[in-house]
Amino acid sequence: MSYETVIGLEVHAELSTKTKIFCNCSTKFGAKPNENTCPICMGLPGTLPVLNEEVVHLAVKAGEALHCKINKLNKMDRKNYFYPDLPKAYQISQFDIPICSGGYVEIPTKDGVKKVRLNRIHIEEDAGKLVHLEYEPHSLIDYNRVGVPLVEIVSEPDMRSPEEAVEFMKTLRAMLQYANISDCRMDQGSMRCDANISLREVGSTEYNTKVEIKNINSFRELQKALEKEEKRQKELYDFNEGFRIKQETRRWDSGKGKTVTMRTKEDANDYRYFPEPDIIPIVVKDELLEKVKEEMPELPVERKARFEDQYKLGSKEIEILIEDKALADYFEKLVEAGCESKTASNWILGDMLRLMRETETDSKAIPVPVEHMNQLIEMIKTKEISNTAAKEVFEEMFKTSKEPKVVVKEKGLSQISDESALQKMVEDVINNNEKSVLDYKAGKKQAIGYLVGQVMKQSKGKANPPMVKELLEKVLSE
């Protein structure tokens, strides 16, 4: 039987505020455990929450960027459940009247642009973080994250493959970053998602029972988790006639490469939602709506159009650059510093992106300052170093944040342009590569490429390639 995959995502994005949603505690990441807490966010008796105005501002901004209807009158609700990371034993969220309804995100697919509908955007407070110790019978709790404001962006089940889900996340991340709503640092947990997935017979319009997958913290893990769950459900249907998937919450175990059962999936009634009695309904005024529209910065679609007009780059290069605001910003700063746009793109999308992936470095934390990158490229242009040596220098710059001139001096990588020194290397290579020399003299001009490579190898990448080629041609023509 052929199946169609149905996927919907619930994306949590922490808002870029300096303080928490209901108190003055800092939201800064990386503090000592339980340092950024107070009686309010810990829910101690006698404390009352005060809604952070900037939270409403950023939530409205998210709704505007994502084409939502802004509900001018909305309210906060209590979501009741017990878990160690929730000190109040309830979470202040939004239930039946969220701040934003509807909306959509347009994603690229192999068949063109696809519109993925949104169900809603609502405001809520984040929970704490459980730290599970290996080989220990207990866990630790860090409450710093309790009360950090976030928006939950809920999609409709419009995605039909793990690849589409990843594109949705990438596009959404770019939108939120560009609008300065969230930094979306998945490595720090400021953007997370739960995935809902089910299968149905191709051609069917009915939805089957969905499974929710939690513990997904990167685009790569999202794709893997959905692919594995897709395969698991397909096998259950194929080998068990009349089988019905049970509604449950599963956790992605990246170590084992599979989803594992956490608990039976709850319904809204299980959470006993009721209006938050300590916070009055939220009224979104027309002045705020106007302010949000006026301050909306350049969004990814607009930046893409500008890049196509302003820079001589291919569409795929532009797509990768604008996908990540910090990366696109780095590119533009490098071009502003005097670097040619194609050269800047080649370095960023080549060696830089490779090292970022290998070291899991976030684009907001690139260890090579723009001015150092520009210096390196200038050193190649002025023939102070070869392209081969430049790659070695860049790797060291990425590891240490040192200036390129310092690395070149430490490693002795200055390009050899002294003709007498190169002449000796050229003669050595000619004397030791008789076959290639004879091939060249017999008319196989491509043989000179091999000889140039041998000189570069002998010089450990420091010889000036154009000078080497010129000297080889001169000697071989005598």
Curated annotation (Swiss-Prot):
One of its GO terms (biological process) is translation. One of its GO terms (molecular function) is glutaminyl-tRNA synthase (glutamine-hydrolyzing) activity. It holds the Pfam family GatB_Yqey. Keywords: ATP-binding, Ligase, Nucleotide-binding, Protein biosynthesis. The keyword Nucleotide-binding applies. PROSITE patterns: GATB. It comes from the Bacteria. The keyword Acetylation does not apply. Its EC number is 6.3.5.-. It catalyses: L-glutamyl-tRNA(Gln) + L-glutamine + ATP + H2O = L-glutaminyl-tRNA(Gln) + L-glutamate + ADP + phosphate + H(+); L-aspartyl-tRNA(Asn) + L-glutamine + ATP + H2O = L-asparaginyl-tRNA(Asn) + L-glutamate + ADP + phosphate + 2 H(+). Belongs to the GatB/GatE family. GatB subfamily. Heterotrimer of A, B and C subunits. Allows the formation of correctly charged Asn-tRNA(Asn) or Gln-tRNA(Gln) through the transamidation of misacylated Asp-tRNA(Asn) or Glu-tRNA(Gln) in organisms which lack either or both of asparaginyl-tRNA or glutaminyl-tRNA synthetases. The reaction takes place in the presence of glutamine and ATP through an activated phospho-Asp-tRNA(Asn) or phospho-Glu-tRNA(Gln). This is Aspartyl/glutamyl-tRNA(Asn/Gln) amidotransferase subunit B 2. It comes from Clostridium acetobutylicum (strain ATCC 824 / DSM 792 / JCM 1419 / IAM 19013 / LMG 5710 / NBRC 13948 / NRRL B-527 / VKM B-1787 / 2291 / W). The lineage of its organism: Bacteria, Bacillati, Bacillota, Clostridia, Eubacteriales. The gene is gatB2.
